[in-house]
């Protein structure tokens, strides 16, 4: 998406033509990606819940909890 007459969002002499409208899809892709990271579908026993997560996931802790849960259910790892 290149604009032949310069950047429509900024007048001539403002930002260069390689500016924000061409970077905008990357920004949207980024926001979608972060949304996917923040709301991960977690399924146990066929039930799916969307759990919003606002902090980095400690996978070691999650795996430990999952193993404890499965051991409690009588699952042999």
Swiss-Prot record:
Protein name: Uncharacterized protein in sor 3'region
Induction: By anaerobiosis.
Organism: Acidianus ambivalens
Superkingdom as given in the UniProt entry: Archaea
